[in-house]
């Protein structure tokens, strides 16, 4: 995925991973961090100011509210352990531009995927890539899944 000069939305940013890391690595990329917890937003804004990250916008709102007014705004949307995969897709896919990507990082993705194929068709997305890896120092399995939003049929 070409990240440079794109717009990225990180859902449920928490402490800022991956949103803040992407903002540091790609200063020409606009990053929107969505976080409903005010204390976490305070932290994200503090880091933004200390590191002078002019490409970051921190929004203290719920994903559902943000999604109502920002349809097909971002080239890439990321989410980690914010909600079950089905809900992440439901909230995140409307934010993604056509041909853009939704990237989910989950720990027990196999348990969540048993009934999701019909849902992928309904949302007009296809799985493009999947990377399974162990977190360093934890020996804990994670899966990154990249979905691409398709044109309406």
Predicted regions mapped to residue ranges:
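Short gly/pro/ser/thr-enriched loop/turn and capping motifs at secondary-structure boundaries
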Residues: 40, 96, 109-112
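Short glycine-/small-residue-rich Rossmann-like dinucleotide-binding loops
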Residues: 81-82, 107
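Active-site capping/gating segments
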Residues: 32, 108-153
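Helix-to-beta-strand junctions that scaffold the AdoMet/dcAdoMet cofactor pocket
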Residues: 26, 96-98
